[in-house]
């Protein structure tokens, strides 16, 4: 028997709709179970989107499906609801470009060379690298702990009995880590106060015989006394006559004078002259003026001698000249005669 005779007469439109043999037709005011507001871009599905499943499968199963399997139904449901991000359980398309992103289709019509087109191709090839930085917080012990220091040396913690201790005013305030030697401290204060030497009895440093660090303390004592003598200001002398500056006397002599000094020797102390005349002669050779009293001129001479002696440049120069003199057996050089006179 022909299978087509088993089907009862039914509306051809319904059969075409469910069998999928007739063309699709949009039905206005189609009844539906749920209403969703969609935008114009989401109203109709695109050609590349797959057909979505029907919203309610019971509508299809309500027809006579007992005689045989029916063809898959074609529905006209809005694709924005099923395939979009607003559908229940739907997954949004992660490949969609964000708004304002670079689109290669917009720049295909440009009239540019192949090299420029190749540059545009690098834009699409670029893939940014995502670098995740791990934030690690590690406990640590700081090397230095900030603390508020002494604002003023005269601001001290008061005594428990509320009596003034005058620390820093009447009693010398020193750090407790390294105490000063009382004898050295007294000499320093005496030097600063410029008291008369005989005003107070001299303090003498003492060391215990059983002290283990006796040698070290002796070296510290010698170094402290040397520092006191170095810090002592030079004596101030007011000359009655005008004297040249020490820096001017230390200047290099003219070349002709140096040439002359190389060919002759300065008078030594064996010359038959009294001390006053010999002092005048030496001061005259060094461009130091000599007046009736040669004491001030000799003071300038000895000051010049100390400047040459303490100057490291001249000291090194004179040591080299002395070595050369010892090797050659003669004397000469810059300020050679002056050095002989000054004893350098």
Curated annotation (Swiss-Prot):
Disruption phenotype: Individuals have short, non-motile flagellae. The keyword Chaperone does not apply. InterPro entries: Intraflagellar_transp_cmplxB. Residues 18-30 have a biased composition (Polar residues). Keywords: Cell projection, Cilium, Cytoplasm, Cytoskeleton. Pfam families: IFT46_B_C. GO terms for cellular component: ciliary base; ciliary membrane; cytoplasm; cytoskeleton; intraciliary transport particle B; motile cilium. Residues 1-100 are annotated as: Disordered. One of its GO terms (biological process) is intraciliary transport. Residues 1-16 have a biased composition (Acidic residues). It is found in: Cytoplasm, Cytoskeleton, Cilium basal body; Cell projection, Cilium. Forms part of a complex involved in intraflagellar transport (IFT), the bi-directional movement of particles required for the assembly, maintenance and functioning of primary cilia. Plays a role in maintaining IFT complex B stability. Component of the IFT complex B, the core composed of IFT25, IFT27, IFT46, IFT52, IFT74, IFT81 and IFT88 as well as associated subunits IFT20, IFT57, IFT80 and IFT172. Interacts with IFT25, IFT52, IFT70, IFT88 and DAW1. Belongs to the IFT46 family. This is Intraflagellar transport protein 46.
């Amino acid at each position: 028997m022909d299978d087509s005779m088993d089907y009862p007469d039914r509306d051809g439109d319904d059969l075409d709709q469910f069998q999928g043999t007739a063309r699709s037709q949009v039905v206005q005011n189609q009844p539906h179970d749920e209403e969703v507001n969609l935008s114009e871009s989401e109203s109709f599905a695109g050609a590349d989107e797959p057909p979505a499943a029907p919203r309610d499968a019971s509508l299809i199963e309500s027809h006579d499906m007992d005689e045989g399997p029916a063809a898959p139904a074609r529905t006209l449901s809005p694709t924005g609801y099923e395939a979009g991000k607003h559908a229940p359980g739907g997954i949004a398309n992660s490949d969609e470009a964000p708004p304002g992103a670079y689109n290669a289709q917009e720049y295909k019509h440009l009239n540019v060379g192949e090299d420029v087109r190749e540059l545009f191709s690098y834009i699409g090839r670029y893939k940014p690298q995502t670098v995740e930085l791990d934030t690690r917080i590690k406990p640590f012990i700081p090397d230095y702990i900030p603390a508020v220091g002494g604002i003023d040396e005269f601001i001290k913690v008061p005594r428990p009995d509320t009596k003034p201790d005058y620390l820093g005013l009447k009693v010398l305030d020193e750090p407790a880590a390294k105490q000063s030697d009382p004898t050295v401290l007294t000499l320093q204060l005496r030097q600063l106060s410029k008291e008369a030497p005989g005003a107070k009895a001299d303090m003498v440093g003492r060391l215990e015989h059983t002290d283990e660090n006796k040698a070290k303390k002796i070296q510290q004592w010698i170094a402290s006394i040397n520092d006191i003598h170095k810090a002592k200001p030079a004596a101030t002398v007011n000359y009655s006559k005008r004297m040249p500056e020490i820096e001017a006397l230390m200047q290099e002599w003219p070349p002709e004078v140096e040439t002359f000094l190389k060919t002759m020797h300065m008078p030594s102390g064996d010359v038959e002259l009294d001390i006053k005349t010999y002092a005048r002669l030496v001061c005259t050779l060094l461009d130091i003026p000599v007046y009736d009293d040669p004491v001030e001129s000799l003071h300038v001479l000895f000051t010049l001698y100390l400047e040459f002696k303490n100057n490291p440049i001249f000291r090194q120069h004179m040591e080299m000249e002395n070595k050369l003199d010892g090797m050659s057996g003669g004397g000469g050089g810059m300020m050679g005669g002056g050095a002989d006179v000054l004893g350098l």
